[in-house]
Regions:
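Phosphate/dinucleotide-binding and metal-coordinating scaffold of catalytic cores
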Residues: 2-278
């Protein structure tokens, strides 16, 4: 009972802090709230999921693979880390006309080649999976594009709410976090079609990464034993990955390991690993 009161109190304090901080944020840095910005009448939205008659007040994303299965669903005896770099090429179109209903028969505002795979760990087995994709040019080189008003980048996440039946948890908490810290991932609701079949409501999200418009840190110079860094709590890999020696691992406080995502495995040194671990 006491722990429940503590958790409730922390949530209330977090909400109050976000409210107070939002009143003092520079208007130019005010986080865009998608649900407060759309004025198209919801009743005009078609309830049909047929691509010929479908329409939505939300952005619509169409992905075409030519019938090729998107890789990433784990098979029997296969480790998640074995397939995290398996991508296929596909075509993506995004329909996002401000003040209009979005239809697949309309002119897309964005059209690009992408490399795409299924993302997640246990969520890879869900009926509705999430995706990670990267914009590319016709030659397969990554390129940065603006998506639904969010900062340009090449790598994006399509989160498919499955266990969260409200469909709001990640969208709500990312936006709330963004009112407190501007580097929290930006998000937009959208509706997704895959090879002409409706997949449901998704959340288009920025991937947590170092760079302009994402987490803007001091770039590692490759020489110093001190660096800005990003770590990821993840399941242990079967690959040769050096994990951090830290309290969470030897005290078994989390079911996973902490892996350095930036500066990255190819640039990490024993001295830098020790610095980050401390």
């Amino acid at each position: 009972m006491n722990s429940r009161k503590i958790y409730t109190g922390l949530v209330v304090l977090l909400l109050l802090a976000a409210l107070l901080l939002s009143r003092h944020i520079d208007p130019e840095k005010q986080r865009y709230q998608q649900h407060l910005s759309y004025n198209t009448q919801v009743e005009d939205t078609s309830l049909s999921i047929d691509e010929d008659t479908f329409s939505s007040h939300l952005p619509v994303v169409s992905i075409e693979t030519g019938g090729v299965v998107i890789p990433g669903r784990p098979e029997q005896g296969q480790h998640v880390k074995d397939i995290e770099n398996s991508f296929i090429q596909a075509d993506m179109r995004i329909y996002d006309r401000e003040g209009e209903l979005n239809k697949l028969s309309s002119q897309p505002v964005l059209e690009s080649k992408i490399n795409i795979r299924v993302r997640g760990n246990s969520s890879r087995t869900f009926d509705k999976v999430g995706y990670l994709f990267k914009f590319t040019d016709d030659a397969g080189m990554e390129r940065k594009l603006e998506v639904m008003g969010m900062e340009k980048d090449s790598t994006w996440v399509l989160h498919g709410p499955y266990l969260d039946k409200t469909l709001m948890r990640n969208y709500m908490w990312y936006n709330l976090a963004g009112q407190i810290m501007e580097w929290a991932p930006d998000v937009r609701y959208c509706e997704v079609f895959l090879d002409h079949e409706y997949q449901g409501l998704y959340v288009m999200a920025e991937q947590i990464s170092m760079g302009e418009g994402r987490i803007e840190m001091t770039k590692y110079d490759g020489k110093s034993n001190i660096s800005s860094y990003i770590v990821c709590a993840d399941r242990e890999s079967v690959n040769d990955v050096q994990y951090l020696d830290n309290f969470t691992s030897y005290a078994l406080r989390i079911n996973g390991k902490l892996e350095v995502k930036y500066p990255g495995a190819s640039r990490i040194t024993p001295e830098l690993t020790e610095y980050i671990s401390r």
